[in-house]
Amino acid sequence: PKHKRFENLGADDKNGVFICLECLKKYDSIKVVFFREEETGCRGSSEAVMSFFDDVRFVIQPDRKGNSDLITSIGYADLCSEGFMEAIEPEKWGYMEENGLMTDILTLKEKGLEVSCLNVSCGYYNAHTDEEITVKKDLMKSLLFVEHIIEDCTNTYPHTQSDSYFSPYEFEDEIYDIRL
């Protein structure tokens, strides 16, 4: 064809879906939710029926690029408790705490979700580009880490969001003063 159209892999969503489906096959008791339009303002999660989460121990979102990021805060908003972090032993699994950007778990926290939440790297790179790839080894590392959390972290890990999300306008006065 004269005008070849390329669609990216969509691994930023598909890798997380793969992990969820694998967990659904393996575990008799697990809840999984898929939200629409995360990249365009978390529209699906903003309409979530929060009672769905009443009996969950924690929430894991496998939706982060790379192979070692563990998003435990977004801006100034913590997403999980110290007790949860101790229980999951991220360093032992090759994960490090990082600060992330807007995502569905932040929206759920803002809607009142009171359990610990994480966003974990799941093996994709170059999201939303023609060069998007999945590294299978990194995807499987994420799956094993998620399985570890499900199997070994059997307590409920409460966490109430106390800090607000970082607003880009929060420091507008300081930025303005610097430019003068």
Task: Place the predicted regions along the sequence by residue.
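Alpha-helical scaffold segments in soluble metabolic enzymes
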Residues: 19-22, 107, 141, 145-148
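Hydrophobic, Leu/Ile/Phe/Ala-enriched alpha-helical segments that form helix-helix packing faces
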Residues: 23, 88-92, 146, 150-153
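Gly/Ser/Thr-rich active-site loops/lids in small-molecule metabolic enzymes
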Residues: 80-90, 138-146
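Zn-dependent metallopeptidase/amidohydrolase metal-coordination segment
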Residues: 96-142
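His/Asp/Glu-rich mid-to-C-terminal helical/loop segments that flank catalytic regions of hydrolases
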Residues: 126-180
